[in-house]
Amino acid sequence: ASIPRMFCETDSQTYELTSSAEERPIGSQVVLHPKNDWMHLFEYDTFKKILVGYGEVLPYPVYLHHQDEEELVNTPSPVWLDPKATRKELLDYGAKVFQSSALDVFRIRTESGRVEGVLYVLPFRTQFSVRNSHKVYLKRMLLSEDDCNLLPQWAFFIRCLVNADGLLSTASRESLVSNDLLKDARKEIGMAIKDYLRGLVQNNRAMFNKILDVHHFHIKAIASEDNELLRLFMDYLPFETNKGVRNFGSIRSADNVICYTRNLEDFRQVRRIAGAQGWLVVNAAYTFDETLLKKYARLNPELTLDEISPSRLLEQFGEVEAKK
């Protein structure tokens, strides 16, 4: 039989390899001795919390021994990686993990980076500058509660619970290495989100409307960069007009000429005059709105955009007065 070997660190932070006279079973055993400054991390409750946090979904059983008792602390087959799990089970699990409900949940899987898991649609509005909490695992061990740049920049209405088997971590194991593989994985995840929304428009309009009510700003961001989704989503997107908020479908059906203003001050000055003349004017001062109008008009030549300004209205009224 082979002689057991021991690889030990000394107080001088050097290492030595020695033989052990004690018989040991086949395998490896790692013994860690905390330094005095870190003894508090090895108190039972603290240690268990850390162990569960990082190792909860490791694919092998992990046992914690304490006072002659043995406790299984992980779930080698978590519900969010179970293809047979129901939507309700996934929503319930997400509510437990993130302490927040979700509007909906859907599965993703990528070829690049071998990312697998579920994405939750947040039930509240978020700003582009706000960082949401996530759970990103690398080879089934928790890596970060940040999205690690796995999500596209516009996907702030999404919370991810995913595991990546084919991506690399930074040396500090605090995030994922930014390389072409991560970029390709992010692109696939972006396509999965778009496919999900496309499917809702076609098959579950009620759910799409719920998401649109909360996250129309983010849906506009998606539509502004994807012509196919622009065609699909545009009629449902809300725009502010001098006659209240209307979806674009109702604006387009009113007239093939769409009048709009580029900034809020112009809109405030124009809205009453336009209302008196019976015109419908869109306030395109908000982020993405003018871009969406112009891109949609280019894709639909039968539509004409007409930019309205206070000075132009005054000129038109002057011409009318001169003709009298």
Short names for language-model regions:
Residues 1-324:
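Conserved GHKL (Bergerat-fold) ATPase module
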